[in-house]
Amino acid sequence: MSKRDYYEVLGLSKGASKDEIKKAYRRLAKKYHPDVSKEENAIEKFKEVQEAYEVLSDDQKRAQYDQFGHAGANQGFGGFGGGGDFGGGFGFEDIFSSFFGGGGGRRRDPNAPRQGADLQYQVTLDFEEAIFGKELNVEIPVEDPCDTCKGSGAKPGTSKETCKHCSGSGQVSVEQNTPFGRIVNRQACGHCSGTGQIIKEKCTTCHGSGKVRKRKKINVKIPAGIDNGQQIRVSGKGEAGVNGGPAGDLYVVVHVRNHEFFEREGDHIICEMPLTFAQMALGDEVEVPTVHGKVKLKIPAGTQTGTEFRLKGKGAPNVRGYGQGDQYVVVRVVVPTKLTSQQKDLLREFAGQEEQDDSLFGKLKRAFKGE
C-alpha cells in the first residue's frame, strides 16, 4: 500500500512554514491520539501524522522528501516508530503525558502518614500442636522508630528544616521545550528527596533515617485446628508506620511436620490399622490410637482389607470454630511371614473345605492367637 503525501496528511501545501507545520501536527496529534480519539483507525492515523511531522519539521529530511519523495525521506534516516524522540531526552510519551494527565497530575503528599510494611514469619509445628493449638513467643527483626531522635532522624535538640528549593512541597517545576511550546512538569525535589524537609544535623544513632533495626519479641497464639500452609495475621506487629502512619501487620505462616501414624485431610484424620487374617475373618475388638487418646473399635467378622471405619468427633477442630472433624480408620490385613506347623495345617484344612464350620474357625482363631 502506497504512502500518502506528507503535506496531504497534515493538510498543508508544499510551501507551508515551520510554524504552520507545528500547528497542524499539534492539532492532528491531539485529535488522533489513542487515549483521546474513539475513531476505529486512530492509531494508524496518529502514526501517519507523527511520521509526516518527523520529516517535514526537519530541514534536511524535508529537502530530501521534496526532491525524492518517500524514497528520499527514508534514505538513511531509519524508521518512524512510535518511540521516536524529538531530541534532548523528551519524547512523544512525555508530551502526551503532559497533555493527558501524566507529568502534570496531582501527586501524593510526601509527608502524609503511610502504613508500615507487612512482615512474614515461618513457624514449624508438630502434628498434635497444630491440632490443639499453641502459644508461641517469637523474635522478629523489625525497623522501629529510633529511640534517640523519636523517629525524626534529626539530632536531639535540633529539628528538620523546610527545604528552600521546593518550599516544603517536595516538588519542583521543570520547563522543557516541545513542538507544542514550553511545557512545565512537576517532579520530586532532588535536594530533599521529595520530602520537603532537610535534616542538617542527623541523629548519630540512626544516621538520619529515623529507624533502627532490632529484634522484637511477639506473642503469637496458634489456633487449634490450623493446617499446613495456613497463615495467621497479627495486626499491627509489622514495620513501624511512616510520618505517624499505622504499623504494618505480621503474617505467621505455619508448617506442620508429618506424623508416623496419622495423616490429615482438612478437619479429618486418616490412619491405617494393621490386623491379622484371623481378626478380619473372625471379628475382634481392637484399640485404635487417636490424638484424643485410645478408643475401642469393633471389627465385624468377615471385614475386608481396605474397609474404612469412622470415629466421630475424633478428628481436628475446625480452625474457624465450625465443629470437629472425624477420624477414619482403614484396616489392612497383615499376612504372616512365619507360620508354625499347626498354623500351616489349619490353613491347608481351611483352604480345602468348601463349607466352613464353627469348630474350624475356633481352631484358626486360637492358632493365630497362640492359644
UniProtKB/Swiss-Prot annotation:
Q: Does the keyword Repeat apply?
A: yes
Zinc finger boundaries on the chain: CR-type: 133-215
Residues the entry annotates as binding Zn(2+) 2: 163, 166, 189, 192
Q: Where in the cell is it found?
A: Cytoplasm
Which cofactors are reported in the record for this sequence? Zn(2+)
Query: What is the recorded function of this protein according to its Swiss-Prot or TrEMBL entry?
Result: Participates actively in the response to hyperosmotic and heat shock by preventing the aggregation of stress-denatured proteins and by disaggregating proteins, also in an autonomous, DnaK-independent fashion. Unfolded proteins bind initially to DnaJ; upon interaction with the DnaJ-bound protein, DnaK hydrolyzes its bound ATP, resulting in the formation of a stable complex. GrpE releases ADP from DnaK; ATP binding to DnaK triggers the release of the substrate protein, thus completing the reaction cycle.
**Name of the molecule in the record:** Chaperone protein DnaJ
State the organism named in the record. Answer: Bacillus cereus (strain AH187)
